[in-house]
């Protein structure tokens, strides 16, 4: 008989904030296994945010930005009798955060000419204020789901 696996336990947080979401953001920013570089980018971005925000709480801005970017619904393709329908589906919590990290990283990298830490800080600040490209992406995904609401009865 197979041994019972340990399953998924709680992940460790990051060093400075001891927060699991910040650790996941660092992992999302990381390229080619260079975690020290990714950690420096994220912490520098948080320092920039702390200097720009009155209360100085970068973690609160980050959490608000994540909440504003994470999508509630998305469309999934399903083939029904020769036609492909875009079916709106609720997004599971783990995918919501993964999409939010992905979009924040993607649209921060597209911003013009400064360091990645400055671009990430600008994107997080914009996202916390319901602005920026990552929030537009979330709104676009929600609009697609709203437009295809008629096909919701085809759920998987």
From Swiss-Prot:
Protein name per the record: Small ribosomal subunit protein uS7
InterPro entries found in the cross-reference section: Ribosomal_uS7, Ribosomal_uS7_bac/org-type, Ribosomal_uS7_dom, Ribosomal_uS7_dom_sf
Organism, as annotated: Chlorobaculum tepidum (strain ATCC 49652 / DSM 12025 / NBRC 103806 / TLS)
Annotated family: Belongs to the universal ribosomal protein uS7 family.
Highest taxon of the lineage: Bacteria
Swiss-Prot/TrEMBL keywords: Ribonucleoprotein, Ribosomal protein, RNA-binding, rRNA-binding, tRNA-binding
GO cellular component, one term: small ribosomal subunit
Binding partners and assembly: Part of the 30S ribosomal subunit. Contacts proteins S9 and S11.
Summary of the function given for this chain in its UniProt record: One of the primary rRNA binding proteins, it binds directly to 16S rRNA where it nucleates assembly of the head domain of the 30S subunit. Is located at the subunit interface close to the decoding center, probably blocks exit of the E-site tRNA.
GO molecular function: rRNA binding; structural constituent of ribosome; tRNA binding
GO terms classed as biological process: translation
Gene3D superfamilies: Ribosomal protein S7 domain
């Amino acid at each position: 008989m197979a041994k019972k696996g340990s399953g998924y336990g709680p992940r460790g947080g990051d060093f400075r904030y001891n927060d699991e979401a910040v650790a996941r953001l660092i992992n999302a920013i990381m390229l080619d296994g260079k975690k020290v570089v990714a950690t420096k980018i994220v912490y520098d971005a948080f320092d920039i945010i702390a200097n720009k925000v009155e209360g100085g709480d970068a973690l609160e801005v980050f959490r608000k930005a994540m909440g504003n970017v994470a999508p509630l619904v998305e469309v999934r393709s399903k083939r029904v009798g020769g036609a492909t329908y875009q079916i709106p589906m609720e997004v599971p919590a783990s995918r919501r955060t993964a999409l939010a990290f992905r979009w924040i990283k993607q649209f921060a990298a597209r911003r013009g000419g400064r360091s990645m830490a400055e671009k990430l800080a600008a994107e997080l600040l914009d996202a916390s204020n319901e602005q920026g490209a990552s929030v537009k992406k979330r709104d676009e995904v929600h609009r697609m789901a709203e437009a295809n609401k008629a096909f919701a009865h085809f759920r998987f």
